[in-house]
């Protein structure tokens, strides 16, 4: 696969379950990063933030065809900063639903639950769109503009829904790691989120949003 200009649309075939599930295990570098990422989770929340930053770097390399896609977590400062920005974005996206849920609970306003739940579902649905475009183009506006993320998710159409199906399946499978004395979940959860990063980087059209 040749390198491509970031201004060119990347029309990727929808990823399959098999390729998506195997991608985080496909190379020695990938397996090394998975093991390191899982071990990092022992130092929460820093480990979780590092994994998030690492995942965004991998998404960038997938789009720009910069193999090997898995190049470790160094420099740690860069990876941590990128993860912190993405963590802030998650908080921004989920804030409206969490505020409504808190008010509903504290003041016993049942009607607010009918606002909080849809807002939570919508925010969760569009987050991968925003994260993917931020990762691919270093466009930080997607981290604080849920409306732009929604536009990308909508643009993704059925491919975006297909990516969600694979992603949710991987997340559910990751809970099998709890059977390995619980500690296995550290590694299966990292595997699942590596799958998530891969499927959304493949499924979205990834058209550079210049002037939009």
Predicted regions and their residues:
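Selective recognition of hydrophobic, aromatic-rich stretches within alpha-helical transmembrane segments
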Residues: 41-64, 105-144, 175-211
């Amino acid at each position: 696969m040749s390198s491509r200009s970031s201004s060119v649309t990347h029309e990727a075939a929808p990823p399959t379950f098999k390729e998506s599930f195997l991608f985080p295990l496909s190379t020695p570098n990938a397996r090394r990063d998975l093991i390191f990422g899982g071990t990092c989770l022992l130092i929460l929340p820093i480990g979780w933030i590092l994994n998030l930053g690492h995942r965004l770097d991998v998404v960038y390399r997938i789009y720009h065809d910069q193999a090997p896609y898995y190049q470790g977590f160094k420099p740690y400062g860069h990876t941590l900063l990128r993860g912190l920005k993405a963590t802030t974005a998650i908080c921004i996206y989920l804030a409206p639903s969490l505020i409504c849920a808190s008010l509903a609970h504290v003041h016993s306003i049942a009607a607010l639950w009918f606002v909080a739940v849809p807002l939570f579902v919508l925010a969760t649905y569009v987050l991968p769109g925003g994260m993917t475009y931020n990762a691919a183009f270093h466009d930080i506006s997607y981290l604080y503009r849920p409306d732009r993320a929604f536009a990308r998710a909508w643009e993704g159409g059925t491919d975006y829904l297909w990516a969600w199906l694979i992603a949710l399946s991987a997340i559910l499978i990751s809970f099998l790691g709890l059977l390995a004395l619980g500690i296995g979940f550290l590694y299966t959860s990292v595997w699942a989120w590596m799958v998530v990063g891969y499927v959304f980087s493949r499924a979205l059209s990834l058209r550079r949003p210049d002037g939009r």
